[in-house]
């Protein structure tokens, strides 16, 4: 087979495009977690460094449910801001701490879920962690006075819900973002939820 200039250029061009066409994956996960789900929403809901929304110690997590943002407070009055999905059935607010953390958590529908969606009864004993699990790749269980509030910060199986009122009350993040946050937050972290 004769190699022409055209075939050489076509092959070279196609080779440079191939990596861009493939989704970047978060390494080390048991399931394929895309690192580019944030491309599915408005730019303002993508992870970025911004001014801190409140004066708080570095490491504090702040949730602003009204604007669909979650912040991890850094030093020098700065924060990492993430877009989130928030509850469609009311606004809960308050101060909590991270009382439990799970990788690829099991999801169990609450009585409220079952009232709205009786078909979820099949998961009454729990849906195993995975890409179709509504809790996504990680979950932070929010506690007050050593008791579970039933509110969570977790991943999502529907990235397009970020920036919308789409959850049953919890705070949903892109799976890549919640994995990133999980690696930086520890048990007992203060979480301030504003509505």
Where do the PLM segments sit?
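N-terminal secretory signal peptides and thylakoid transit peptides that target proteins
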Residues: 1-16
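Exported/periplasmic cell-wall-interacting domains
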Residues: 56, 89-94, 105, 116-195
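Residue-level marker of structural boundaries
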Residues: 17-18, 187
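Boundary at the C-terminal end of the N-terminal hydrophobic targeting segment
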Residues: 20-23
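Cell wall/extracellular polymer interaction/catalysis modules
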Residues: 25-116, 131
């Amino acid at each position: 087979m004769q190699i022409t200039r055209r075939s050489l250029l076509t092959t070279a061009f196609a080779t440079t495009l191939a990596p861009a066409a493939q989704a970047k994956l978060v390494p080390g996960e048991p399931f394929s977690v895309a690192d580019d789900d944030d491309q599915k929403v408005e730019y303002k809901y993508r992870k970025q460094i911004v001014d801190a929304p409140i004066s708080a110690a570095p490491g504090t997590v702040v949730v602003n449910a009204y604007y669909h943002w979650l912040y991890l407070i850094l030093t020098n009055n700065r924060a990492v801001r993430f877009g989130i999905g928030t509850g469609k059935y009311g606004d809960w607010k308050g101060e909590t701490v991270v009382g439990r953390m799970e990788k690829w958590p099991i999801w169990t529908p609450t009585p409220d879920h079952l009232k709205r969606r009786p078909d979820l009864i099949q998961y009454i004993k729990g849906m195993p962690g995975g890409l179709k699990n509504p809790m996504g790749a990680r979950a932070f269980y929010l506690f007050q006075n050593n008791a579970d509030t039933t509110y969570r910060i977790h991943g999502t199986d529907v990235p397009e819900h970020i920036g919308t009122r789409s959850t049953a009350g919890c705070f949903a993040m892109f799976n890549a973002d919640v994995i990133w946050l999980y690696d930086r937050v520890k048990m007992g972290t203060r979480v301030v939820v504003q509505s």
